[in-house]
């Protein structure tokens, strides 16, 4: 995952597409970061924390004010009782939480099962730890996992089952039945479940279901989330892990040698964010849902086939109806032809499995509506 076919360091497709956006003046819908700041209450809390002197190393597990806020959040939204002192760890974003978890809980040769396509860090982290990466396909157009394929993939060799729900890049939200099957298989094969839930508040329709709330799951589930997507603070890199005490202690043992600690003035600010009223959380989902609908409709009008996402930041569109069977090639010409940047889904798929996703493109709708309207207008050039 880290090296190209020539053995050299491989630049990410995200870096390549962002560079194309700059060189062509195209609208960058390739990367999943918002273009608006989060709530003023959070920004002011960060400014105040800096003024108040929270500028040195915070505690290794995170500042108590944030750990308490995370615990209260889990109880408030999901009815989960989480000990802030023994079951909560603050990390440098969800990605560090994932890295510390995978490196702490796997040995070389262990198997880690993920859905595919997958967030690109998954494969890299699994590879760094020497584990074997096993995938279960999410196929177009519905991007739902097949139960029989889950049963075949999860075996006595499986150490971790890593699921991202809501799912990046497809926007799929896994059903309760699918999550219950995963818990059943984890229990049968004595595997741990790692859930990446960074889009937990960005679900359209049915409420988010944390795996840890399901019967029999709590004692074997490591839940990872972050503030960046919920509060438009992706640059602050404040994430967290919640897990049973013995498991969390193992994760902390690795995490302390990654970043050690991070983000002291941002931690109390995110604590403020987690305590915002329900209206804030329902409002951000409703606003993002409108943006999803705006971009999805524009992509359909431009000639793409679109799978409507159920959560998260992204929509997947098929460029085949426009005459492009190779999304990587399409994404390299689209900035010049249409003035918009997307990312090929093949960037989220292992080399040997890319043919099945060859014509699919991911677009981000976590932008200002005026930017999305401009992008939709530009995409009209593809019809001509």
Q: What is each model feature region?
A:
Residues 127-134:
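A short helix-loop-beta submotif of the ANL/AMP-binding
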Residues 102-126:
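Conserved PLP-anchoring active-site segment centered on the Schiff-base-forming lysine
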Residues 134, 138-205:
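Active-site phosphate-binding strand-loop segment of PLP-dependent enzymes
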Residues 152, 333-343, 347-384:
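PLP-dependent enzyme catalytic core of the Aspartate aminotransferase-like
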Residues 271, 288-296, 306-319, 356-357:
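Conserved glycine-rich beta-strand-loop-beta hairpin in the small C-terminal domain of fold type I
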Residues 2-93, 100, 149, 275-276, ...:
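N-terminal small-domain helix-loop-helix segment of the aminotransferase-like
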Residues 24, 129, 188-189, 302, ...:
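Helix C-cap/helix->beta junction micro-motif
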Residues 219-289, 296-298, 302, 383:
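Conserved core segment of the aminotransferase class I/II
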